[in-house]
Amino acid sequence: MEWLGETAYGDALALQQAAVADRLAGRTPDRLLLLEHPAVITLGRSSDPANLRVGEGGLRELGVELFEVARGGDVTYHAPGQLVGYPIVDLDGLGRRDVHAHLRSLEAGLIEALEELGVPACRVPGWTGVFVDRGRSARRDGPERKIASIGVGVRRWVTFHGFALNVRLDLEGFEAIVPCGLYDVEMTSVAVELAREEGPRALDARRLAKLDQRVREAVARSMQVQLTS
C-alpha cells in the first residue's frame, strides 16, 4: 500500500499510466495506490451526458475539474475526505483473467473494511459498488445508501482505476451529478453512518481526526487479502 495524500487528478492519471507500464514490463510488483483528489468529476466509458447536472462552465465556477476517463461505469465525484484506491494488479499473474471477479474482490475488500469500522455494508444485486446494509443499520428507511463507487480499466490484464470510499467528504458535491447513473440511490459516508450507529460521539473532533488513518489501515488490510488470494 502506498499513501500519496492529496493528488491532482491529472497527475494521478499519469502516475497510473506509468505504473501500468512498469507492471507490464515486470519492473514492479502489484501495487495499491491510496490517495485523495481535489474536487473533480469523472466520466466513465458508460457515462450518459444527462447524468451531469451542471455544465462545464458551472463546474469551473465551483472549482470542480471534469475528466473523461477509460474506466467502466458512469459519472462519479471525488473530493477531499474520500479515500480513492487504484490497484495496479496483474490479473494474468494471479491466474484469473476475469474483470468481474476483480470487481467483486474490490467490493469484498471494502465491505470487510467497513464492517471492521462498525458500518454494516453489503452488495446490491445488479449494481457495482458497496452499499449500507439497511437491514442491519440504525436507519432502515429510505432509498439504498451507496458508500463506495467502483470502476476499473484493464490493459493487457493489468488493472488501473479502482474504488472511491466516502469517508467524511461534503456529500453536497454529489448534487452536481446522478452518481453512477443511479437515480434512486442516496450517497452516504463512513462519518455519517458511524454517527447513526454510535450517536454524536462518532463526530467528536478527536475521533474524526483519526478516522482517515483508521479507514486507510482497514482498507489496506482487507485489500491485501482480496487482491492476492
Regions found by a protein language model. Give the residues of each.
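Short, conserved beta-strand/beta-arch hydrophobic-aromatic motifs that form part
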Residues: 52-55, 147-167, 171
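Generic serine detector
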Residues: 46-47, 105, 137, 149, ...
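C-terminal accessory segment of soluble enzyme catalytic cores
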Residues: 153, 164-229
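Generic "edge-of-domain/loop-turn" microfeature
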Residues: 92-94, 137, 157-159, 172, ...
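N-terminal lobe of the biotin/lipoate ligase/transferase fold
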Residues: 1-144, 176, 201, 205-209
